[in-house]
Design a protein with these regions (language model features):
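Hydrophobic alpha-helical membrane-insertion segments
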Residues: 13-18, 82-93
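Hydrophobic cores of alpha-helical transmembrane segments in multi-pass inner/ER membrane proteins
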Residues: 53-62, 120-135
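Individual transmembrane alpha-helices with interfacial aromatic-anchor signatures
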Residues: 82-88, 111-128
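Hydrophobic alpha-helical transmembrane segments of integral membrane proteins
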Residues: 86-108
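Loop-to-transmembrane helix junctions at the membrane interface
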Residues: 69-88
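Interfacial loop at the N-terminal end of multi-pass membrane proteins
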Residues: 21-54, 69-73, 103-112
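Cytosolic juxtamembrane helix at the C-terminal end of the final transmembrane segment
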Residues: 134-149
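Cytosolic juxtamembrane helix and N-cap/initiation of the first transmembrane helix
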Residues: 1-18
Length: 149
């Protein structure tokens, strides 16, 4: 097993873990609020559940793309582009860590403070994004493809 497949497999497992976490907190408004959901969203349980389950579906799809890149499930459409895009989304979300750290250091000023949950979420997102990108770039030539692009 190559390093790129291992990286993508880990990224996929972590995406599934995020999906499970998202699904669980979607049914408990106080947990959703604790982990950063807007108060307006939390005040309507039906919308909270729908939004949470839609996010869960997205994270499951992300996980399936990682496993497809590792060769564990069938090839998905636009696999290479999808893996890079998913890695980019996670990494961009993770880069919110920079203003959080700058604010904590007193270099930047924001009206709202950053919670430890937001900091942890940024770190996790950055880690997962880098796993997707590293696995995709390192193993670009060995990624399964119906037609090598």
């Amino acid at each position: 097993m190559t390093i790129s497949k291992q990286l993508l497999r880990i990224a996929g497992v972590l995406s599934f873990a995020v999906a499970i976490f998202q699904a669980v907190i979607s049914f408990v408004p106080s947990w959703s609020l604790y982990f950063g959901a807007p108060k307006e969203l939390v005040s309507n349980a039906t919308i909270l559940i729908i939004a949470g389950l839609l996010a869960t579906i997205v994270f499951v799809i992300f996980g399936l793309y990682a496993l497809a890149g590792a060769g564990d499930v069938r090839i998905l459409p636009l696999l290479r582009l999808g893996l890079l895009g998913i890695g980019g989304v996670y990494t961009l979300r993770g880069l919110l860590l920079i203003p959080q750290l700058l604010t904590m250091a007193g270099i930047l000023q924001f009206n709202e403070s950053f919670s430890s949950q937001m900091l942890a979420s940024s770190l996790i997102s950055l880690l997962i994004g880098l796993l997707y990108l590293a696995g995709s770039i390192v193993g670009w030539r060995e990624l399964p493809s119906k037609n090598k692009n």
